[in-house]
Amino acid sequence: MNTLFIADLHLSAQEPAITAGFLRFLRQDAIHADALYILGDLFEAWIGDDDPEPLHGEIAAALKALQQAGVPCYFIHGNRDFLVGKRFARTSGMQLLPEEQVLDLYGRKILILHGDTLCTDDQAYQQFRRKVHNPLIQKLFLAMPLRWRLKIAAKMRARSQQSNQYKSDSIMDVNPQAVEQAMLRHKVHWMIHGHTHRPAVHELALSNGKAHRVVLGAWHVEGSMIKVSADAVELIQFPF
């Protein structure tokens, strides 16, 4: 018995090898799990559930097949695909979760999240995040014609890539105080997240005892997953 976690696949039509690797992962690994949790940035970009991109339908069908095989799939939005909505969730069989969720798995209480909210030193990003998560702004954006949304998304990605070139690694990583506050607030000693693309297992000393923060890697040249069982919490990097 085990539960699997993944994040930061950044699927797109331009990276067919990653898509193939993900579909293989669903068939060979996820199919044997108690559940699959996707902690954001499954897609490189998401401009609305009405986008007719064929890749989206292919991924939805594969996730639906997983659900129909008896493996539930849960999704937390990332900074790239925060507009994934109820329509895609229904089509894919995924269950949408809030940005922070506490799980009780095999005797461990684990806080799961995408991870971008922990990067509080990057004030410019946090300000941008507050804007794009405003329900009114999202409603206005989704009401635009698809071609407008495509252009806006492309400009935003280019601007983000340019901005990140001038940011230090420390600013783009999690803030230790933000991590501790989140774990104390939820009364947990385990945290799993993605976003930073820095796979590692961190041992922490909180005010209420020892804790662990496990970070998923991005799917670039290899896959990354966390396997939680009654015996262990394992970070696993694997070839496509």
From Swiss-Prot:
Subcellular location: Cell inner membrane
Primary location: membrane
Listed cofactors: Mn(2+)
Residues that coordinate or bind Mn(2+) 1: D8, H10, D41, H197
Organism listed in the record: Serratia proteamaculans (strain 568)
Function: Hydrolyzes the pyrophosphate bond of UDP-2,3-diacylglucosamine to yield 2,3-diacylglucosamine 1-phosphate (lipid X) and UMP by catalyzing the attack of water at the alpha-P atom. Involved in the biosynthesis of lipid A, a phosphorylated glycolipid that anchors the lipopolysaccharide to the outer membrane of the cell.
Keywords on record: Cell inner membrane, Cell membrane, Hydrolase, Lipid A biosynthesis, Lipid biosynthesis, Lipid metabolism, Manganese, Membrane, Metal-binding
Any one Gene Ontology cellular component term annotated for this protein: cytoplasm
Positions bound to Mn(2+) 2: D41, N79, H114, H195
This protein's record includes keyword Kinase: no
NCBIfam families per record: lipid_A_lpxH, PRK05340.1
Binding site for substrate: N79, R80, D122, S160, N164, K167, H195
Species lineage: Bacteria, Pseudomonadati, Pseudomonadota, Gammaproteobacteria, Enterobacterales
Pathway: Glycolipid biosynthesis; lipid IV(A) biosynthesis; lipid IV(A) from (3R)-3-hydroxytetradecanoyl-[acyl-carrier-protein] and UDP-N-acetyl-alpha-D-glucosamine: step 4/6
Gene3D superfamilies in the cross-refs: 3.60.21.10
Protein name per Swiss-Prot or TrEMBL: UDP-2,3-diacylglucosamine hydrolase
One of the Pfam families matching this protein, by short name: Metallophos
Gene: lpxH
Catalytic reaction equation(s): UDP-2-N,3-O-bis[(3R)-3-hydroxytetradecanoyl]-alpha-D-glucosamine + H2O = 2-N,3-O-bis[(3R)-3-hydroxytetradecanoyl]-alpha-D-glucosaminyl 1-phosphate + UMP + 2 H(+)
